[in-house]
């Protein structure tokens, strides 16, 4: 039986990953939106500019779709394979940091969906790292 901290961390990870799927789905919808963006707040915050830029696609696949699939994969790993989840969350965080740099330095505009996803994946990484450490300690104490 798993300890309550492990169960709590698993629940938090699943909730965060589901939030990531939702935010990525909104960005995915924005990628194909031809109407004015609902999150075009001002000249510094505009999801339309970000999601229609050439940086929003990797090998003809929208980055938002990668996010949907990635968060779904991470959710499926929560509580089952903590070390693998932490490794994949780190890879996702590195990819996200690259996209954050693109928003900041190249596009010079921010997307609220993207920033939300950045916060979510950073939190997922930290919690999954903690879960992996606790899992390893539990195995060692057996």
Regions found by a protein language model. Name each.
Residues 1-142:
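Membrane-interfacial helix-loop segments of redox and metal-homeostasis proteins
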């Amino acid at each position: 039986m798993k300890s309550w901290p492990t169960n709590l961390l698993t629940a938090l990870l699943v909730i965060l990953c589901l939030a990531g799927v939702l935010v990525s789905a909104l960005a995915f919808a924005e990628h194909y939106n031809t109407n004015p963006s609902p999150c075009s707040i001002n000249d510094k915050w505009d999801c339309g500019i970000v999601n229609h830029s050439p940086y929003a696609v990797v090998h003809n696949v929208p980055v938002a779709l990668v996010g949907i699939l990635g968060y779904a994969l991470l959710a499926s790993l929560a509580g089952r394979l903590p070390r693998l989840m932490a490794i994949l969350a780190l890879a996702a965080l590195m990819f996200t940091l690259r996209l954050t740099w693109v928003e900041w330095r190249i596009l010079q505009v921010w997307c609220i969906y993207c920033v939300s996803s950045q916060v979510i994946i950073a939190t997922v990484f930290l919690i999954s790292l903690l879960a992996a450490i606790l899992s390893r300690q539990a195995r060692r104490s057996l």
